[in-house]
C-alpha cells in the first residue's frame, strides 16, 4: 500500500526510513528526514499498515509505503510459535518495496515494520543503520544491530558497540536560552508543567490535584499547566475542580518550546524523546516512568538523568507514591537553587544538532 505525499520519481536514489508504531520511533525519524531533505536528499518511509505512521508521515510531505505486520511481544506462546509464518510474508513484502525504490541506505528507528524492512535490506546487500532511542533497546533494533553497518544510540549503554549521538529534538527547543538566563528575575508562584503524553497519564491526573491541594494548604504557591490528552480532559478538569486547585488544563500543547521556556519544573513520563527535550531545554524534572513500558525502558532512561543530577525518579507502583510525590514536590517547589542546579545538569546532557549528525552519517554510508 502506498500513501503518496511527494512524487516517487526522482533522479536520486532515496534514503529509506523504517519507523513506526509509536511517536517515540516516528518523531526522531521525521527529524532526520527533515535534515536529509534540507540537503536535497529524497526520503521514502516504510511503515506498518494501519499504524500511527500512516497518518503522521504524509503530513510532512513524505511518501510512505506500508506492509502488513504486527508485533510479537506480549501476545503469548502461540503468537511466538507463529512468528515465522507472519514475519516471512512481511520480509518478502519489504523486499518488493526495496526493489522498487532501490534506496541508497536503509535506516531503522524501530517499530513494527523495521524488523522485516531491516532484514530485507541486509538480504539484498543494502547498507543498514540502526538508531535506538532508549537505554534498553527494543527487540527489533537488538536483532538488527547485529547486522547493521552503523549502530547509533540516544543514550550510552544501549549496545556494546555503539555511537552515542543522542535523540533529535526540535530546533526551537534546542535554541532556548540557558536555564540561568530564563530563571533570572522570576518571582511569584513556581511554574509546574505536567506532561501526560498524547494519551494522557491517569496516575498524574489523579495524583497531582490531590498533592497540590495539600501543598497549597501549606502555603506553597504553584501555577500549574497540565497536558492530559484529549480522552482524559474532562476527567482531569474534574479532578482539579474537586481538589480546589486552579490549573490550566490542555489536551495537547502545540508549542512545546514555549512550554519548556515557561516552566520551572516538569513532571512527566520518561520516554526517550521527552527526556531529550528536557535536556535540550535545560529544565529539571520529576520522572514517573510508565510501568508497562517494554523491558522497563522508561525507568532505564530516567536513571540516566537521575545519575547526572538532572531529575528525580518516582515509581507509580510504589505503595507510598502519593507520599513520595508530595515530599519531592514540597522540596523542589520551595528550593529555587536546587531547581536551577537540576536544570543546568539537564542542559549539560544535551546533544546538539543530532538530526544533522545522523543525516551526515547516513550520507557517508550511502551507496
UniProtKB/Swiss-Prot annotation:
Catalytic activity as recorded in UniProt: di-trans,octa-cis-undecaprenyl diphospho-N-acetyl-alpha-D-muramoyl-L-alanyl-D-glutamyl-meso-2,6-diaminopimeloyl-D-alanyl-D-alanine + UDP-N-acetyl-alpha-D-glucosamine = di-trans,octa-cis-undecaprenyl diphospho-[N-acetyl-alpha-D-glucosaminyl-(1->4)]-N-acetyl-alpha-D-muramoyl-L-alanyl-D-glutamyl-meso-2,6-diaminopimeloyl-D-alanyl-D-alanine + UDP + H(+)
EC class of the enzyme, as a word: transferase
Gene Ontology cellular component terms for the protein in this record: plasma membrane
Signal sequence residues: none
InterPro entries assigned to the protein according to its UniProt record, in alphabetical order: GlcNAc_MurG, Glyco_trans_28_C, GlycoTrans_28_N
EC number(s) stated in the UniProt entry for this protein: 2.4.1.227
Single GO BP term: carbohydrate metabolic process
GO MF annotation, one: undecaprenyldiphospho-muramoylpentapeptide beta-N-acetylglucosaminyltransferase activity
Keywords carried by this UniProt record: Cell cycle, Cell division, Cell inner membrane, Cell membrane, Cell shape, Cell wall biogenesis/degradation, Glycosyltransferase, Membrane, Peptidoglycan synthesis, Transferase
Binding site for UDP-N-acetyl-alpha-D-glucosamine: 22-24, 134, 170, 198, 253, 298
Predominant location: membrane
Entry-linked Pfam families: Glyco_tran_28_C (PF04101), Glyco_transf_28 (PF03033)
Membrane topology, as annotated: Peripheral membrane protein
Cellular location(s): Cell inner membrane
Pathway the protein contributes to: Cell wall biogenesis; peptidoglycan biosynthesis
NCBIfam families attached to this UniProt entry: murG (TIGR01133)
Family: Belongs to the glycosyltransferase 28 family. MurG subfamily.
Stated role: Cell wall formation. Catalyzes the transfer of a GlcNAc subunit on undecaprenyl-pyrophosphoryl-MurNAc-pentapeptide (lipid intermediate I) to form undecaprenyl-pyrophosphoryl-MurNAc-(pentapeptide)GlcNAc (lipid intermediate II).
Protein name, UniProt field: UDP-N-acetylglucosamine--N-acetylmuramyl-(pentapeptide) pyrophosphoryl-undecaprenol N-acetylglucosamine transferase
Species annotation: Xylella fastidiosa (strain 9a5c)
Organism ancestry: Bacteria, Pseudomonadati, Pseudomonadota, Gammaproteobacteria, Lysobacterales
Name of the gene this protein is made from: murG
